[in-house]
Amino acid sequence: MELQEVLHMNGGEGDTSYAKNSSYNLFLIRVKPVLEQCIQELLRANLPNINKCFKVGDLGCASGPNTFSTVRDIVQSIDKVGQEKKNELERPTIQIFLNDLFQNDFNSVFKLLPSFYRNLEKENGRKIGSCLIGAMPGSFYSRLFPEESMHFLHSCYCLHWLSQVPSGLVTELGISANKGCIYSSKASGPPIKKAYLDQFTKDFTTFLRIHSEELISRGRMLLTFICKEDEFDHPNSMDLLEMSINDLVIEGHLEEEKLDSFNVPIYAPSTEEVKRIVEEEGSFEILYLETFYAPYDAGFSIDDDYQGRSHSPVSCDEHARAAHVASVVRSIYEPILASHFGEAILPDLSHRIAKNAAKVLRSGKGFYDSVIISLAKKPEKADM
């Protein structure tokens, strides 16, 4: 089976679907002010045709309610500028393209569109024809839009996914060079870490080059993804998954060879690696870069404070929180896990993930490192 056929979130609307388990993104409120600033600066710059039709691409939109949370924030940011100008006629038509791989559950996405349009008219006074939303399926590591056609490109929690498993993870004798590991983790040797970094460098460079061609001069990109600000200071979702698969091997429920042949195309870069690649590729200026922490169990309760490390790591809801974390992890990785190990293993694996998540939450290290980076396409010399 081709890798792209399983590199998607779990579809549908069941208990293990991404739609039911993606609410944690709603609590990453650090992104919204930067998003608003990007869009408002774009509109005030009076770039070509932007006040007639503002064109947006959401790269790696996945499925579920949070797809439209981002869209709503974009629309509200655009309309906020119109309100400041006190001229409703200056509100541009908005055209938004939702992008993900062909296997993404776009059916679930567009089932939510009628209610989104109703809420948009109620909250923003926008008729359906003033905000046009469509799909643009395909890999965001390839061309998606015509040259110099887009004003703003956005991607949230996608760019840590690589286009392929790095080469060099198997020796000439066919033995795994990353035994006991499923990605570039703490136990991986330097050659493995270099292989993953090399693949990320290649992919991120391609991403920047291709999408710089699609953006108009001085167009913007806002990217948020997993990083490793503190080297292995606290385990991320991949570490939870790796620990849990190893538990199944130790307990005799899974063959060691199955684990050793499982390599996930994910890499969490450092901010220095991100900055270096952007500067070396050369198409963009870095306007803003910030790292922050998102807790494992964000989305478990709307009453929690998820702005940082402020909440207590121990809770009377510990087991429920850990089960929530396991459901989120399963909703993200189930297609690739089922493809390699088979579906029968998933319930036992989820149980181990919950047990390991409880331990990490109890230790106070249940956080993901994330980076937000705002980029502006450098103008051509003739435009300066």
From Swiss-Prot:
Function in brief: Involved in the biosynthesis of caffeine. Catalyzes the conversion of 7-methylxanthine (7mX) to theobromine and of theobromine to caffeine. Has 1-N-methylation activity.
Domain of life the protein comes from: Eukaryota
Disulfide bonds: none
Enzyme Commission code(s) on record: 2.1.1.160
Keywords carried by this UniProt record: Alkaloid metabolism, Magnesium, Metal-binding, Methyltransferase, S-adenosyl-L-methionine, Transferase
Enzyme class: transferase
Tissue/organ expression: Highly expressed in developing endosperm. Detected in young leaves and flower buds. Present in immature fruits (grains), but barely in mature fruits.
Stated name of the protein: 3,7-dimethylxanthine N-methyltransferase 2
Binding site for theobromine: 157, 160-161, 237, 368
